[in-house]
Amino acid sequence: MTAELVRGQNHPLPDTRLEIRVSAGHPVLAGATLGDEGGRVPGAEWIAHPGAPSLPGVDVPGAPAADQRLSVDLGAMPGTVHRISVLLALTGHGGAARFGAVAAPFVAVAGPDGTEIATYTITGLDRESAVVALELYRRQGAWKVRAMGQGYEGGLADLLGDQGLERPADAAAAILAAAAPEAAPAAT
């Protein structure tokens, strides 16, 4: 049976191979940060995003889209990783610059056979342009998922700064640049 989570609620993860599905109704950038026991992200190389979509144990989409799929292999996570934060951000391309102007994002965690383990609809967002949707965390050797829904009005830079990343504005700018649509060819 699928657990329908509310903000702050957690649920055990019976599988180590997971697919995280995002339905946002508007193109969003989807990514993940890998953090230590305190949730601190030690450096920009611990962020999976469109410009660097693969890290040990996690693969994220290469471009913003309304429907996203992230692959996670908890068994392949380095031993120093205790938290995986799934993040969503509006890039400002295509109109919407705040989550309050779009439909509430829906996130589902599914096992290797596609069966949903847990779902979460991220409600209550308004002026925020970045949000930690879910957190996968390791406690006493077992992995769980927690519905977060923690939004950031200051966008991706504030989100990354909150996770202890040094120079978060630089990292956010690089991530958003990697997610920007390619410039249209010049007309001749």
Regions found by a protein language model. Give the residues of each.
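Intrinsic-disorder/low-complexity signal
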Residues: M1-T188
